[in-house]
Amino acid sequence: MNRYIYLLLICVFLPISGCDDYGIIHIVDQVDEVVIDQTLGLPKTIIGRNGSMMALIPNGIFEMGDHFAEGEQSEQPVHEVELDAFYMDMHEITVGQYRGFIEATGYQSLNWKKILDVSPTDNHPMVHVSWFDTMSYAKWVKKRLPTEAEWEYAARGGLAGKRYAYVGNIHPSKANYNRNIGQTTAVGTYPPNSYELYDIAGNVWEWCLDTYDPNFYSISPRKNPIAEANVFQLAEDFSDDNKPHILR
């Protein structure tokens, strides 16, 4: 998985609240509806006040970083990370959802022509927003951005040591990349990964909570790491002009 300081979009979010002894986030006062997974006995999906479906990402341990030496030096060394369970939006935040935020709060206007040129409908992902724009939206919906570790863990979907977030090679039937469409695609156009997260590869960049530290992988704590050492925020994933190796 690559990380960049190139900025384009709004990201998936996680609810802000405490956790129980199992690391599961308490969300009763922050959602409209809870769907119980009968096997796990835990809320597998939740529906937030902004209408976003959120999937439960189980706690676990994974190897974070570039296993194939195809990315940036800052993606080394590969190291073991342990994360608590959390919920993540199943889709990228849409133009319609962000428009609702602006209308409700009077937040500063954006360059809508530039946005609609590549994301033309309310069901397309929101683009051309800064990290501060995403943080303002997150505060409004009582969520937060995922850390880089949370994002990578969720994006991998439980596929340890694989090149892509899907089984097999990347293909135009699985993701919007390499300008094969010419603009963003509506959220949910392609199949999800095994954690039920859509468009986790391709389509648009996604912001992370961390600040950028090129040496952080060498000093990262094992449990729930977050980099806070610099002024640049992290963006995971890229836009539709990504080459296949960027979608790792």
Sequence positions of predicted segments:
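Positively charged n-region of N-terminal signal peptides that target proteins for export
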Residues: 1-4
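Bacterial N-terminal signal peptides
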Residues: 7-15
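A generic structural signal for short, non-catalytic loop/turn and secondary-structure boundary residues
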Residues: 9, 47-50, 55, 74, ...
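Bacterial signal peptide processing site
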Residues: 20-22
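Functional-site microenvironments in short loops/helix caps that host divalent-cation chemistry
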Residues: 63, 67-69, 108, 114-248
